[in-house]
Amino acid sequence: MVDMDWKRKMVSSDLPNSPKLSSKLHVTIPSPFKIVPVSSPISCSAPALCSAYELYLRLPELRKLWSSRDFPQWTSEPILKPALQALEISFRLVFAVCSDTRPYINHREWNRRLDSLITKQIQLVAAICEDEEEEGISAEAPVGGGRSSLSLLPQLATWRRSEALGKKILYTIDNEMSRCKYTLGLGEQNIAGKPNLRYDAICRPNEIYSLKDNPYADHIDNHENQTLYIIHQILESWIYASGNLLNRIVSSIEEEKFGKASNDVYLLEKIWKILAEIEDLHMLMDPEDFLKLKKQLQIKSTGKNDAFCFRSKGLVEMMKMSKDLRQKVPAVLAVEVDPTGGPRLQEAAMKLYARKTECDKIHLLQGMQAVEAAAKSFFFGYRQLVAAMMGSAEMNATASQESCDSLSQIFMEPTYFPSLDAAKTFLGEFWSHLG
């Protein structure tokens, strides 16, 4: 029970005709209040499984491309480089799907899903570029006059099988980059005559293309092998970008640049949603061919809470870092955690919400909770995806006898932000008593 009389006094001047409240408003609040380390159900699979996953996707080679710094003065390069490389790999997926001659493949739905996924990626790239301009660093971006000569997209826009989708992508780039000072330079119209980003120098499409084959390409005769490989390379590229974005969010909060952190935290939410859309592409793979590939690649559960996604060290780290944003709430609210477990944080949050004088902080806290929702949704959706692709027996095999599987534990965990949750509970109860 918590005394809410201070809140009544705080807002009473704004509500002269409101019904009189009792001197004390008592509400039941979620527990616990005290921020304590929460045992996380997420951890990497066995080292041998993680290593096999990395070698299959050629992640060590990709990581060198993601982490290369060709333009040290350009502060957005660590985020935009892997993002643009994810986009380029997506063009390779379009090429692979359009080249697939199997008569039983749902090409129409593939085209729709790829259009949607690439559009969302372009929107996210454009949002990152727009934020550069707001922060006054767009001048650092490497631009030039020429278009890309190495990207696959111009070829997709002229090849008969992919022409419609390729031209649609070019139109999307033109539209989404309209608010930026430069454009991507992939063959879009660019009627405004804006400078082109030095796409080839940043993205290195030729080096990306050199990684087009996985180690099993020569001795596994299964078209879904290439599809699976490309899908996960796109996924891992965005995961790498998110790690750099999370580091930037933490730095911005520590420097009290809450507006910048707010912009970035919503970009992070979008990345989680893009990851879910990438995973959903698995549903378009042929069921029998996919299960045959699973056998050929010797992919199997160990039966010890070993969901397949936990073989990605990057994804596990991304989830942990997203969850650890909860530790930055006291810094945002400018109060210290009460060592006795008192309601110091939630009271500060309620005052922040009510006064509305520090909007950047409100937006940041809302964004943090949006990231939590998106991350938990990703793992919930992934659990359903595994069951749909491989059967529920496969999903149940990852659960131990003592508890439910790790994926279920993730989205069933209590909120990562109990103080914000309690503050909103109080405010909701307060306003409900005014009516």
From Swiss-Prot:
Keyword NADP included in the entry's annotation: no
Domain of life per record: Eukaryota
One GO process term, biological-process aspect: L-tryptophan catabolic process to kynurenine
SUPFAM superfamilies according to UniProt: Indolic compounds 2,3-dioxygenase-like (SSF140959)
InterPro entries: Hs1pro-1_C, HSPRO1/HSPRO2, HSPRO1_N, Trp/Indoleamine_2_3_dOase-like
Disruption-associated phenotype: Shows high sensibility to P.syringae pv. tomato infection.
Induction remark: By bacterial pathogen P.syringae pv. tomato. By Salycilic acid (SA). By the bacterial elicitor flg22.
GO molecular function ontology, one term from the record: heme binding
Location relative to the cell: Cytoplasm
Alphabetized Pfam families for the sequence: Hs1pro-1_C, Hs1pro-1_N
Keywords, in A-Z order: Cytoplasm, Plant defense
GO cellular component, one term: cytoplasm
Main location: cytoplasm
Cross-referenced PANTHER family: NEMATODE RESISTANCE PROTEIN-LIKE HSPRO1, NEMATODE RESISTANCE PROTEIN-LIKE HSPRO2
Subunit structure: Interacts with SNF4.
Described purpose of this protein according to its UniProt entry: Positive regulator of basal resistance.
Listed name of the protein: Nematode resistance protein-like HSPRO2
Species name: Arabidopsis thaliana
Highest classification ranks of the organism: Eukaryota, Viridiplantae, Streptophyta, Embryophyta, Tracheophyta
Gene name of this polypeptide: HSPRO2
